[in-house]
């Protein structure tokens, strides 16, 4: 799908098709941010690294290809909104904001320490580029509904992206918000469900089954895409389709169900719920980086084969 976007810093003048070069650029950016996430957890002593790594591809492509944002003017009225509903994954989100220029790297080096602006949960009153404070799970989609309705009332058009976790979808408030998004025909809402199948207490299926997520959101009135959450091409095509739906006057919000792995890319973390939260010393960080070297090579090889 090739859309003539009229959005953001990258569009239309700097917009490029999703070709091999662009795909590789995003792969390398995601690799850099995964490493940044782990290093930040070392600086801060600990962090919710598992869910941050499972969602990093989503945040990478949004912030580096799609979102209409300006680090020099972070409060511009028509900016796209991003809601990290799984707010505990700030250790992954903060590096994304630093990389885009919303704050200096020095802030990461004091992550979650006394006096730091950024902690385990982001505070929108302290951190440039953060649209809302999150952490109490289940409320991100409700906030996005409010943002979308406010834009409609004020005559301002922007996209509202929400990143939730599958464990978070245990919360009933998500489904009240889903009903509202469909009822008010908020086609500028795109919900990403990070379906990594793990939560703090164990496997999601053992705690509270949420599948089939695609059929559930479809029943709630959403356009639904189910993708490999670690495949940039699949993410790109789903996001482009969601934006096109809105630009073409569609009347449904979009849900993108991302099948992912907790701790993606780090062999001793991957698919292990015990890495929902954890700490790394220098030895573990070195092992993680070595694993990420192999992971990047595998992903770039896939690009060479499929692009």
Locate predicted features.
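Generic beta-sheet signal
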Residues: 80-82, 158-162, 189, 250-258
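N-terminal capping segment at the start of a domain
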Residues: 30-46, 194-196
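Short acidic, glycine/serine/threonine-rich loops at helix termini
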Residues: 94-96, 123, 173-175, 201-205, ...
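Glycine-rich beta-alpha junction loops
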Residues: 88-89, 93, 196-197, 231, ...
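Short, Lys/Arg-enriched N-terminal segments with co-localized hydrophobic residues
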Residues: 1-10
């Amino acid at each position: 799908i090739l859309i003539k976007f009229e959005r953001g810093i990258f569009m239309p003048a700097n917009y490029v098709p999703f070709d091999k070069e662009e795909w590789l650029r995003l792969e390398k950016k995601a690799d850099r941010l995964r490493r940044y996430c782990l290093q930040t957890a070392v600086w801060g002593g600990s962090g919710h690294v598992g869910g941050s790594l499972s969602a990093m591809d989503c945040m990478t492509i949004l912030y580096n290809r799609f979102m209409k944002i300006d680090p020099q003017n972070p409060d511009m009225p028509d900016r796209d909104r991003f809601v990290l509903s799984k707010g505990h994954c700030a250790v992954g989100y903060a590096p994304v904001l630093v990389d885009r220029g919303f704050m200096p790297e020095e802030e990461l080096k004091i992550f979650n320490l006394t006096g730091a602006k950024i902690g385990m949960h982001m505070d929108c009153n302290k951190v440039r580029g953060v649209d809302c404070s999150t952490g109490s799970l289940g409320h991100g989609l409700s906030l996005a509904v409010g943002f979308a309705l406010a834009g409609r009332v004020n005559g301002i058009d922007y996209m509202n992206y929400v990143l939730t976790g599958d464990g978070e979808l245990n919360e009933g408030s998500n489904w009240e918000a889903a009903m509202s998004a469909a009822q008010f025909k908020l086609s500028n809402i795109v919900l990403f469900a990070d379906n990594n199948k793990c939560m703090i207490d164990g496997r999601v299926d053992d705690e509270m089954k949420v599948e089939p997520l695609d059929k559930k959101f479809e029943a709630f009135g959403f356009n639904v895409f189910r993708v490999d959450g670690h495949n940039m091409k699949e993410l790109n095509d789903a996001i482009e389709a969601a934006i096109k739906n809105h630009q073409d006057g569609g009347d449904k919000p979009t849900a993108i169900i991302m099948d992912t792995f907790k701790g993606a890319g780090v062999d001793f973390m991957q698919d292990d719920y015990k890495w929902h939260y954890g700490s790394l010393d220098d030895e573990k960080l070195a092992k993680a980086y070595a694993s990420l070297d192999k992971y990047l090579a595998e992903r770039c090889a896939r690009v060479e084969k499929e692009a």
